[in-house]
């Protein structure tokens, strides 16, 4: 009876975790809307999205019935995450504007795909029980899950240096913290160290980001206001409008050679 109730509670927490994880995957959407509008990635980094992609790939492998049975919720949300990250990285690739950065993104995605393919072949052919496969893939999941939660460290360093959270999306930090918290609870029913350890660490990283956001939110507004009030500052929309006007004027001044 107790086991049945615990199993039901675990499923409920897992469904909540799936919803929050979906919010986590979608939380950078305003960032990418901004990128598309400005046609530039500015100072945003592709690292969090590359880290999330490899994390989703290894968790899909972990959730396969031949690796870790009864993990449908793990497969569905991480499969969805893969599709979302591919869309985000495609947008980043189009608007990054630097060929070197595009090559790096392409190389990392190719390396991640090759790694998962090799890992899947080795685990499924060399290990013949789900317990051994769970152990092997679970360790890899731990590593990449921690990497995903730690990926904003470079952004956090920039926040401390510039005293501005402009390029650290708030909702991404909130969703990351909540996602790690819910999946930590899920991993305790029953205890799954491969989910509990990285998500517990993820809670700490998410909390650190929220503390930074609270500490530098006011200074960010002040810095942005000062920048916009500088005599030489021209907003993107103004610059585009001015460029268009200049082109029209130049066209009208050209002699008709027809």
UniProtKB/Swiss-Prot annotation:
This is Bidirectional sugar transporter SWEET7. GO terms for molecular function: sugar transmembrane transporter activity. Disulfide bonds: none annotated. Induction: Induced by the pathogenic bacteria P.syringae pv. tomato. It comes from Arabidopsis thaliana. The keyword Transmembrane helix applies. Forms heterooligomers with SWEET8, SWEET11, SWEET13, SWEET16 and SWEET17. Residues 33-46, 95-102, 156-166, 215-258 are cytoplasmic. The lineage of its organism: Eukaryota, Viridiplantae, Streptophyta, Embryophyta, Tracheophyta. Its main location: membrane. The chain crosses the membrane at residues 12-32, 47-67, 74-94, 103-123, 135-155, 167-187, 194-214. Belongs to the SWEET sugar transporter family. Pfam families: MtN3_slv (PF03083). It is a multi-pass membrane protein. InterPro entries: SWEET, SWEET_rpt. Residues 12-100, 136-221 form the MtN3/slv domain. It is found in: Cell membrane. One of its GO terms (cellular component) is plasma membrane. Mediates both low-affinity uptake and efflux of sugar across the plasma membrane. Keywords: Cell membrane, Membrane, Repeat, Sugar transport, Transmembrane, Transmembrane helix, Transport. Residues 1-11, 68-73, 124-134, 188-193 are extracellular. It comes from the Eukaryota. Signal peptide: none annotated.
